[in-house]
A protein has these predicted regions:
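Extended, aromatic/histidine-rich regions of cofactor-dependent oxidoreductases associated
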Residues: 3, 26, 158-159, 167-211
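Mid-length scaffold segments of soluble, non-membrane domains
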Residues: 90-144
Length: 211
């Protein structure tokens, strides 16, 4: 069992090459997804896909890659909300995990400014950010308790907020995994049609959204 946000981060593009040319962004994301699918199918006890479903597993479904939902050079702004900076975030197995509201990340979709709170955990490096979120696809095309983003700083200290890398927590598929529940403050009132979708062929666990 793990109490980390997830065992498989989606924050790094892989430097693969085909016919001696660099992959473009869409190809890089698709290559990363293929590697994750291979891990889920073949990782043995490390895979969250139920053993009985692994043989038939052909990969997770995703929204098409959309560059409009990748926000480069995002600055971590100070958190100015009314909630305490230090708090206990509930997990899928009923525990509480010490967390910190590190700041907010702002972005614009459809001409409107949106924000998500970014979190860090006790014992982390203090720079890597955990950004869980809910949106208008949650509970239908995507998991009802939200999806995750893991962000590492660039060399200049800024972040890339890329919804194409949004993923479901492992506890979606296997209750052995302990996953933080998405705080209600990170509910977006719009559809984020990027990242992982729910698979119609894999049974998912049930969690409440908006901790």
């Amino acid at each position: 069992m793990t109490d980390t946000p997830d065992q498989h981060e989606h924050t790094h593009e892989h430097e693969h090459h085909h016919e001696h040319r660099p992959l473009d962004y869409t190809e890089a994301v698709e290559a990363f997804r293929a590697e994750k699918d291979d891990y889920f199918k073949n990782a043995g006890a490390g895979s969250p896909i139920p053993v009985a479903e692994r043989e038939a597993f052909t990969g997770l479904p995703y929204f098409p890659v959309d560059l409009a939902l990748r926000f480069d050079d995002s600055v971590l702004e100070p958190y100015t909300g009314g909630e305490p900076s230090n708090f206990q975030i509930p997990t899928s197995d009923g525990r509480l995990r010490p967390a910190h509201r590190a700041g907010i990340l702002a972005f614009e979709i459809g001409g409107e400014r949106r924000v998500l709170t970014a979190y860090t955990f006790d014992g982390g490096d203090g720079e890597s950010l955990f950004v869980p979120f809910l949106d208008a696809t949650s509970g239908s095309e995507t998991y009802g308790a939200g999806r995750y983003l893991d962000l590492d700083p660039e060399d200049d200290g800024r972040y890339t907020l890329d919804f194409n890398l949004a993923y479901h927590p492992s506890c979606v598929y296997d209750i052995r995994f302990s996953c933080p529940l998405t705080p209600a403050e990170n509910r977006l009132p719009i559809r984020i049609e990027a990242g992982e979708r729910l698979s119609p062929t894999i049974q998912v666990q049930t969690l409440d959204a908006g901790a």
